Amino acid sequence: MSLLRSLRFFPVACTGRSARAVLLQPSQPWLTFHAGPSLSSAASSKELLMKLRRKTGYSFVNCKKALETCGGDLKQAEDWLHKQAQKEGWSKAAKLHGRKTKEGLIGLLQEGNTAVLVEVNCETDFVSRNLKFQQLVQQVALGTMAHCQNLTDRLSTYSKGFLNSSELSELAAGPDREGSLKDQLALAIGKLGENMILKRAAWVKVPSGFYVGSYVHGVTQSPSLQNLVLGKYGALVICETPEQIANLEEVGRRLGQHVVGMAPLSVGSLDDEPGGETETRMLPQPYLLDPSITLGQYVQPQGVTVVDFVRFECGEDEQVAEAE
């Protein structure tokens, strides 16, 4: 702007030519200014940078470096960023290994006759509330669901299974991600900078005549996580239902709520004598929502038979978890 201003007020000698003629004939080649292509190129680069930043969530510095490395190719730059983040994640994971991971989330996912519970741990509650961590839990749940659905059906009765940390790590990630769950774990560690563990998963699959009730306590939900329900406690309750029951979903939810609150160790029988507050069998326990009756007394008129359950508590001791 100062250059243009100085050109406007430059004194012109009276040589017989007009000032207009002098100004339109720059005496120095470097005074010629072309605005079109360079500005257009800069705008295009900025647009690519913004697009890559929005798509990947990585810093502007890293996105700019990726575009420069890949010659402005958006897809190659995205792949390059993921590979670099994964390398950094594995490096951070090695450094952070051994740090306590008592926080985290339980994830519940149900699709038709199949339900899964997963637990992913981190170091702080702050990170557990981060969307990137919650997306990792989602990938673990989706990977477990795909694993369960690929198993051979047992048509006559329900099936239930568990996956430990090593088994979970080897599962393929969800349908919109590449690699295994341990690759997704490395990416999350690289982004969030905390030690994390894919602790465990449980899955249940039922045929016709059975139903899976579920409940998660301390619910955290995000529209971007679709049908995934997150919390600090979770339960699946397998019921046999020979007839169609109108309020089956509500009954299943209440049974799951009881399992979370009363922490039974076994189902027990309707004929069992109640053992009071220390009772660990589910059916003889005082019903959580009405302690004046046992859970068995609540269940019997509902027309369902409780046959099994799974309970997860985030951060609980591994020996306790194995016993349950």
Swiss-Prot record:
| A Gene Ontology term for the protein's cellular component | mitochondrion
Q: Name one Pfam family in it.
A: EF_TS
The record lists the organism as: Mus musculus (Mouse)
Give the stretch annotated as transit peptide in the record, renumbered to this chain. 1-44
- Function according to Swiss-Prot or TrEMBL: Associates with the EF-Tu.GDP complex and induces the exchange of GDP to GTP. It remains bound to the aminoacyl-tRNA.EF-Tu.GTP complex up to the GTP hydrolysis stage on the ribosome.
Instruction: Name the UniProt key words of this record, in alphabetical order.
Output: Elongation factor, Mitochondrion, Phosphoprotein, Protein biosynthesis, Transit peptide
Keyword Transit peptide (UniProt): yes
Care to name a GO molecular-function term for this sequence? translation elongation factor activity
Listed GO biological process terms: regulation of mitochondrial translation
Q: Which domain of life is it from?
A: Eukaryota
Cross-referenced PROSITE patterns, in alphabetical order? EF_TS_1, EF_TS_2
Q: Which residues carry this modification: N6-succinyllysine?
A: 75, 132, 191
The family assignment reads: Belongs to the EF-Ts family.
Q: What is this protein called?
A: Elongation factor Ts, mitochondrial
